[in-house]
């Protein structure tokens, strides 16, 4: 395991198969030959871009900022979401805020020290900013908004993050802000060029991010398992992933992602959320709507579920997929973005 290295270049043969990847760490260069390459380098996916990934920004995408804070509530077992996200002027934003308790998980710093911390090594904790005897652990606090090329979100996410953190500071006894970052997130499979003869993009790199809440951890774990199973099932050289991997992603997530993208697109209309939000969050229907929304946003509807919410979700997904058959969904690179 060579932690903290950056993949800087790939060498491909005439058929497009990756034969060698060049990694750089602390100025040292290492070339690694490979039979298969699984790319999991996040939403920006620099290696994915080198391999031909294209992001279709006509579809809904997220803009988000996150930070880490010391908090005595870091060991809580619940993730907190705030769906009515307002800016400093009180204007409702098409997004939400979150607080993920992380316990004593390592935050930032040197990758080797972080790995040692996870292993419980003697130098554990050396990487964490602010470490030094504090009983408080860490929480991930962030916020995000939805956007499209036609209706870009007009919000400074870092300013919104500061406002959101200030609003939650007393309840969470937040310490000093650490490691603020922001990014744009392709969502719901709105990318093309995610596979080649012996390589595949997974997780955030393949836009396997829920368009309704920006969540992608479970999709990252699932797609990692799925691509390994696909390669192993083919035997021998692992088969050609160029069409097989997008087809598998489409089978598992296509209907749900297209439906979620369609619903998320509605949230980018300026008048939609102020009109509908209060009904779902505080109206008489909230007791029904909010549990169902949390379930759908959490990717908790399985193929085995037969209740009303699951049936309606699957039926709506099938209808949406048929109606938006031309929308980019891990599509060939020549497919144009949705208008």
Whereabouts are the PLM-identified features?
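Residues in and immediately flanking transmembrane alpha helices
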Residues: 48, 54, 217, 223, ...
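Short alpha-helical scaffold segments that flank and stabilize functional sites
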Residues: 6, 51, 223-230, 263
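Short, function-defining helix-loop hinge/capping sites that tune catalysis or transport
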Residues: 49-50, 212, 218, 277
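FAD/FMN-dependent oxidoreductases across multiple families
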Residues: 106-133, 147-230, 236-242
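C-terminal helical "tail/cap" subdomain of flavin- and related membrane-associated enzymes
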Residues: 229-339
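Predominantly flavin-linked oxidoreductase catalytic cores and closely associated redox partners
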Residues: 1-172
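Generic recognition of short, well-ordered alpha-helical interface segments
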Residues: 60, 219-222, 271
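Glycine-rich, flexible loop/turn motifs
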Residues: 28, 65, 79, 181-183, ...
């Amino acid at each position: 395991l060579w932690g903290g290295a950056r993949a800087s270049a790939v060498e491909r043969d005439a058929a497009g198969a990756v034969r060698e990847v060049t990694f750089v760490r602390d100025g040292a260069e290492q070339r690694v030959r490979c039979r298969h390459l699984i790319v999991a380098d996040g939403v920006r996916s620099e290696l994915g871009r080198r391999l031909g990934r294209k992001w279709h920004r006509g579809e809904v995408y997220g803009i988000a900022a996150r930070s880490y804070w010391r908090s005595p509530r870091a060991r809580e077992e619940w993730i907190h979401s705030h769906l009515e996200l307002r800016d400093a002027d009180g204007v409702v934003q098409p997004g939400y805020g979150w607080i993920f308790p992380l316990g004593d998980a390592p935050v930032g710093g040197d990758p080797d020290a972080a790995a040692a911390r996870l292993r419980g090594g003697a130098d554990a904790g050396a990487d964490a900013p602010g470490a030094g005897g504090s009983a408080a652990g860490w929480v991930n606090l962030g916020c995000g908004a939805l956007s499209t090329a036609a209706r870009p979100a007009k919000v400074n996410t870092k300013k919104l993050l500061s406002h959101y953190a200030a609003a939650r500071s007393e309840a969470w006894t937040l310490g000093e802000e650490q490691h603020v970052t922001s990014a744009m997130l392709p969502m719901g499979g709105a990318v093309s060029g995610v596979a080649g003869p012996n390589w595949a993009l997974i997780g955030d790199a393949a836009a396997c991010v829920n368009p309704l809440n920006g969540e992608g951890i479970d999709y990252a774990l699932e797609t990692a398992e799925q691509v390994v199973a696909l390669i192993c099932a083919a035997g021998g050289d692992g088969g050609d992933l160029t069409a097989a991997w997008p087809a598998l992603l489409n089978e598992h997530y296509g209907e749900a992602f297209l439906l979620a993208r369609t619903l998320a697109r509605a949230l980018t209309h300026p008048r939609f959320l102020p009109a509908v939000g209060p009904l779902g969050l505080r109206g008489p229907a909230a007791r029904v709507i909010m549990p169902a929304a949390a379930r759908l946003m959490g990717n908790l509807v399985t193929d085995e579920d037969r209740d009303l919410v699951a049936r309606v979700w699957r039926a709506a997904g099938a209808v949406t997929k048929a109606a938006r058959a031309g929308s980019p969904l891990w599509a060939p690179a020549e497919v144009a973005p949705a208008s």
